[in-house]
């Protein structure tokens, strides 16, 4: 806010929960897609909405979340989930289709979705993973992970973050209800990283 007069930002939170993430391309059925969507919406206050509120407010800015409009959410959740499955070869097809015409340039309307982590740059994401590999040996990783019975880390990177958390918020891990991950019970979603970058269908996204 020190470098702009802009005080209000439009953000895209909740579009993933309503219309699908990259990983929901692998939903085994329309019913499974709908159940997952409902779960993600119930948990918004712990993840996306919380992140947006904190990261924007700390910079003395305000956010507007148009996809969070209650009437819009109810409308989209009432759509037959069969129509929301990615059978079109492009994620969030219904949302994109609704903005065809004079609303958005084609290059924006139909571009590939990029993972949230890509906003910090591919190199930083990869550098953090590589750095974590230098911090712990395999033996240290196994030993230190064993210290945690709740939300146990499962990669060296996640252990690094957990130990930073414990350093500043010792003994308060119980406030973390869940660790955001794709539905690992679904085909091709049993991954060790929450980023869509690790999914087989990520393709050219973010380029």
Where are the regions a protein language model picked out?
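An acidic- and aromatic-residue-enriched active-site/binding cleft used to recognize and process polar
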Residues: 14
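Adenosyl-5′-phosphate
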Residues: 4-11, 23, 29-207
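Short catalytic/ligand-binding loop motif for oxyanion handling, primarily in non-cytosolic enzymes
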Residues: 17-21
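Cytochrome P450 catalytic-domain "roof"
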Residues: 1
